[in-house]
Amino acid sequence: MSEERFVSGHRRPEDARIEETLRPQRLADYPGQERVKEQLSIYIAAAKKRGEPLDHVLLYGPPGLGKTTLAHIIAHEMGVNLRITSGPAISHQGDLAAILTQLSEGDVLFVDEIHRLNRLVEETLYPAMEDFALDIILGKGPAARTLRLDLPRFTLIGATTRYGALTSPLRDRFGVVLQLQFYSEEELTRILMRAARILNVPLDPGGAREIARRSRGTPRVANRLLRRLRDYAQVRADGVITRDVADAGLRMMGVDAMGLDTVDHKVLLTIIHHYGGGPVGLDTIAAATSEEPETIEDVYEPYLMQIGFLQRTPRGRVATRAAYEYLNIPYTDHPDEPEGPVQPRLF
């Protein structure tokens, strides 16, 4: 869709520049994700004591939760270089070979969207991950032979929003697998206050809490809303982002009290009004909302499920009683919806 979406967790070009400015360098300065940080701190300390590279790491979860930032921190804590690429950027085996042969001992290679690697490239990656070796096929047909090149020991960090899309052989080659969770309002409030100090944005605690409440548990969304509200406060208020200023600005941007925007409403209303609340298939929802099925599944559904507005069932997606109540629509019982009340709360 062409409509600007303030609450999407996907990175925009303008996000990258700000995120570089706000990015912490140490695990101790990284807010939230306490379980992930505790595990990583142990694994990093142990690897450094042994004088070895860190085991390969797989980070998965919705977009905007800090997977790239963690890759930067891991490289910094290990005292090594970081090389960044993405699954779609490695289109041929030669591309991967060029990247791997340029790594130094202990370096970190971060592959974003690793689920989008093509199969041939992925298979070339297996011996590199397991044996730190690269198999190159010379010649064709019966005369073809394989030349094995030794690689420096390195750490591969893969990031994905679609854990289930990874093949089992690839998943099994990661020694460390960590899932990133949505952030609490308290954690997002701390993130916003820190960002405001760095960016010199006048933000009071009430304004920070209001932004955090509507940021869908996602730091990237919170920081993006902070920047847009800075503009709103400078033009429509005295420059300070208070709770009232944040509320007015977010309403102007179409972000409601639960952090939902017009796209979220369209998804829910499509299920309710066009398909009787469900169950309805993913492709059908995508066609009705003019969105890609992968976008519905990766961007919209995780948050709608987290707050209890949407359920996945064997027969399709179902809008919950909580969604009906929030949208002020009379509820009709659905046999596919799990029994028991679902509260519209993030945490």
From Swiss-Prot:
It catalyses: ATP + H2O = ADP + phosphate + H(+). Residues 257-347 are annotated as: Head domain (RuvB-H). DNA binds at R312, R317. InterPro entries: AAA+_ATPase, AAA_lid_4, DNA_helicase_Holl-junc_RuvB, P-loop_NTPase, RuvB-like_N, RuvB_C, WH-like_DNA-bd_sf, WH_DNA-bd_sf. ATP binds at L22, R23, G64, K67, T68, T69, E130, D131, F132, R173, Y183, R220. One of its GO terms (molecular function) is four-way junction DNA binding. Its EC number is 3.6.4.-. Keywords: ATP-binding, Cytoplasm, DNA damage, DNA recombination, DNA repair, DNA-binding, Hydrolase, Nucleotide-binding. Belongs to the RuvB family. NCBIfam families: PRK00080.1, ruvB. The RuvA-RuvB-RuvC complex processes Holliday junction (HJ) DNA during genetic recombination and DNA repair, while the RuvA-RuvB complex plays an important role in the rescue of blocked DNA replication forks via replication fork reversal (RFR). RuvA specifically binds to HJ cruciform DNA, conferring on it an open structure. The RuvB hexamer acts as an ATP-dependent pump, pulling dsDNA into and through the RuvAB complex. RuvB forms 2 homohexamers on either side of HJ DNA bound by 1 or 2 RuvA tetramers; 4 subunits per hexamer contact DNA at a time. This is Holliday junction branch migration complex subunit RuvB. It comes from Symbiobacterium thermophilum (strain DSM 24528 / JCM 14929 / IAM 14863 / T).
